[in-house]
Amino acid sequence: NKMGKAHIKRLAAPKSWPINRKTNVWVLKSSPGSHTLGTSLPIGLIIKEILGYVKTTKETKYVLNQKKIFVNGKLVKNQKLPAGILDVVTIGEDNYRIIINQKGKLIPVKINGAESKLILKQVENKKSLKGKKTQINFTDGTNLLSEEKYATGDTIVFSNEKIKEHLILEKGSMVYVLAGKQVGKIGIIKEIQEKKGLQPSRVTFTQGKEDYETSKEYVFVVGKTKPLVTLEK
């Protein structure tokens, strides 16, 4: 089934996609890559259905051929390329950051040109190489060679592809919850409970006057006292 490879049935599309499930049966599917289906949106879906820059797939391909669409500053030629949570999507002069709201929906929010230069990447794991170099692997599939000390779960902030800041996953850091019951919430870490064995590590964070708990793997450090980027519409 040719349609099945590039498309999925709307009713089977991830719940995180903010789409109308009752129109055409099929919806564009992301190409496999750095992001899972539920944590990213295909570029074609963003520019056609969600933001309405174009009305047809033919128009989408035309705009891509004009070399005006970028994700995190890199040119996009394929409409199936996924843009994930906190990625920056540039369409001509307009910039958007993909956020996840408290209903668990992925939403592109408009940001200014200065903010569009800020890219946040979370450390997934590290690999020691010969010499003193370490390969830092990020959750978006990219990597970096470095001699600096970065831990799994930390965030590295890039500006114009240069490292601007290192945000540590620790008590007092500001985090954004990407999944689970507390999805979309932003708060300050109160406690990290490292678990051994089969139990996952947990994070207790404070938002306003309330404390919440979530899995450590669901949190993304976004600042020290306030978020460095737009996280709400």
Residue ranges of model-derived segments:
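Ferredoxin-like alpha/beta domains used as RNA- or RNAP-binding modules
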Residues: 1-233
